[in-house]
Amino acid sequence: MKHLSNLLPYLPSTVLLIGCGSPSKQEAKNDQLQKPNVIYLIADDLGIGDLSWYGATKVSTPNIDRLAGQGMQFTNAYATSSTSTPSRFGLLTGMYPWRQENTGIAPGNSELIIDTACVTMADMFKEEDYYTGAVGKWHLGLGPKGGTDFNHEIKPNTQDIGFNYEFIIPATVDRVPCVFVENAHVVGLDPKDPITVNYDHKVGDWPTGLENPELVKMKPSQGHNNTIVNGIPRIGWMTGGNTALWVDEDIADVITGKAKDFIVSHKNEPFFLYMGTQDVHVPRVPHPRFAGKSGLGPRGDVILQLDWTVGEIMHTLDSLNIADNTIF
């Protein structure tokens, strides 16, 4: 049985709609119209000093600045952790990650870390008749204990913890497998070329950053010297799934496009979108539109790319005339 108490302090009061009796059809319709859409975008490894709104002078982030100027800004904020998996766990569950096992930085083949009996933020929105979606970086595991089988339907997944729709990066872009998962299936996977993933030892014969440094377009650091995919050495080893592999330069476009599609598809109903960007986490491989544009190297370039993503979401909301009824 799921319990609501963990997340009650975290849910916006606008979503906690409590009534007595049976509302008329008109009242129900008005209630639907009054529910704001909610978009929670979580960037990765972005510092307060990276944004021009907060004082950055060598890089400009006009779209994020516009968002800040139209809303609230926070100059004193805290997270449950400084790393990916535990901070996302705390955000979605309302629980301290150190009070549950296996909430350290998850490998790419980790089981689903959030207990399916736990009430998540997505569960609470869904209970209030929101259509819920998770798009982008996930890094909270997928599948059962013992590891994820990426060659069949992946269960449990985000749809077992409150999300109606998912299009996600299973872990992080610097970790294998380098594929997208949409609604429990690896996108573009050829069944004749199954994926194998291991974080203990090498699998298959794909080159690695350690053994074949001449093949990389980005030098490895901090253990990023295992299987090479798209010229980038990753953490962990994989083989197979050639038709499903992402292209790093296109990831921001793909994730942003899926988020926009989600918004357009559900513009006539209240929706909750949890969107995790790859930017500005390593490996920093910007699209050619942004490569070299900041004058500050790859990190500066992907900050520009992140700002573009925010701008695309804002433009979509504006074009659908739902920006004023969306908390972003």
Locate predicted features.
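Formylglycine-dependent sulfatase
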Residues: K2-L4, P12, C20-F328
